Every structure is written in C-alpha cells, then in structure tokens.
Amino acid sequence: MKKTILSLTMLLLASAGFAQCGKNAGYEVKAENAYTNYNVRYASNPKDAKNYDTKRLRGEFAIEKVMVPGQVNWTYTMFDRFLIGGAVPTATPLKLTSIAPLYTEKPNDQKNLLDNRELGIINVGGEGIVTVDGKNYTLGFQEALYVGRGAKDITVASKDAAKPAHFYMNSAAAHKSYPTKKVTLKEANNIKAGSLKESNDRVIHQLIIDGVAGVRTCQLQMGVTELKEGAVWNTMPAHTHLRRMETYFYYNVPEGQKILHVMGEPQETRPIWLNNEEAVIAPEWSIHCAAGTSNYTFIWGMAGENLIYNDMQVVKIPELK
C-alpha cells in the first residue's frame, strides 16, 4: 500500500513538473506593467526538437505577438540570452522597462533594461522618435538605432498616432558601453546578393554591425534584407553558425500571403508558417531560410561568441533534407 501511494505521489509530482515545463516553454505570456508583456523560451536540443509536433515547434520557436498598438512585447530566449521585441506607441509614448527575468530584488541588480545589455531598434512603421536619456533620435522607415549598455531612460513615440511607428527590437548581453548611434539605409553596408534566376534576388542592408557607419557593438548584429519582385527565397544556400544564434522578423508581407520558414538541422528540416510582422528563433544548430508566396522583407538579428558576419557553415542545396 505504501509503495502504491509513493508511486502515485511521484507520478503526480512528475505531471506537475510537465505542466510547469509546458508553461515555461513559450506558451505563457506575463505582464510586467500596464503596457509591457513578456514570455520566456528555453533552449532546446536538436535531438529533441526533431520530434516536436507543429504546436510544440511553434511554441518553442515562432513569435506571433510582436507588434500590438499601445504595447511593448518581449520574448526572452535562453539562446545567447537574446531579447526579441516590438513596440507600437500610439497617442502616448512607451517607456522601455526591464522585465522580471532580467532582475531580482537583490541590491545593485539590474533595474533598467540596459544595465547589462545593448539594444538595437529598427523602425518598420511610420516616423517615430526614440528618446535615450533625454536625447531624441528620429527614425524613419527602416532606419536603425544602436543603444549602448548603461542607458537608463528609453522611451519610444510615434510622430502621428494614426500612422504609428513599429519599432522592432533586439537586445543582447553587453560587457562594455558603446555610444548610441543612429544608422540610415544610406549609411549602411548595402550588399546585392542572389539573382532572379535563382529566385533569391535581394539586397542585404547591414545596419547595426560592429565597424559599419561608426557603430561599435559587443555582440549584437542587425540588418534588413529586401527581396526583389519575383524573388521568394532568402538565405539560400542555407547555413548555420555554431558561434551565434539568430532571429528573423518578417514584414512587408502582402495581405493574404505567407512565409514558409525552414528550420532544423540540415538533414532534419521542419517548416514554420509565418504571417506579416511575426518572428522566429533560429538556434545555433539550425538552418534558417524561407520562401514566401510573395516577395517580402525581413530583419535579421544575431548574438553570440564573435562579430565576424561571414562566420558560418554553408549547407550545399543538394544536401538539404
């Protein structure tokens, strides 16, 4: 009888653990304040990930809620402690505050979002203003702002509430403070890649890259890739980079169209369908490429152990499965 009770108790405890694990696997959104929400995604093993069904795969890697009017939404992934976020200020400016997973109640711990972090912001909406410790930076469409570690008071606002700014944000851990710097598309390192014949004619705009346009970063890299009309594939041939993780944020996706994002190990690929203004996490072990039912634009953001943009393991197209 005692053995039976003990077995039942252990089973109940295990079930409770699974329930909690499910909550923490990206399914539970928590409120930090009246307008800021966040969720946490834990790192995963490729041996496990290849067995995920569609719901679990999306729960771990897809980020559907990025841009919501009047809100700041963050996803905190344990892959390189990376933050993926969106802010859409309307009539009222929004302050970028820290979130619970980034601080404790201990003295001298991180109280401001960038006490131990750096931040990249790219605007994909109407004209907006980012204020960093009292200094205003106006960001037009596809203009970027790098904000260095130690900035305390950061707010975002739209110039016209009827045409609000859509600020897409990435943040990574930082060991040093570098100056805040705005970067326009003209100042970016603009690279033509692919061809229409290969269905991947595109322009890569390197915006927040260490050394580009006078920007210095600790580990954060961000940029925009625009596909030309008639092109549908991005990042093909595909690649991985074991020294960095990456995220993609898709936008300029026409109404009624979708993105078929491909992830996983090169011989164990899996599809994730995404809509306009949705994002996806790519672990260091995963390829990250996509085809759209129309051309589109996306923002890539990376963080990891080095700053060499071309440090990657290219996968030959015939090797993909």
Tell what function each PLM region has.
Residues 157-221:
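Surface-exposed beta-loop interaction hotspot
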Residues 139-159, 273-294, 301-303:
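Conserved metal-binding segment of the jelly-roll/cupin
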Residues 1-25:
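Bacterial Sec-dependent N-terminal signal peptides
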Residues 25-104, 108-110, 118-119, 320:
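Hydrophobic, proline/glycine-rich low-complexity stretches
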Residues 161-179, 295-314:
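A short hydrophobic beta-strand segment most commonly corresponding to one strand
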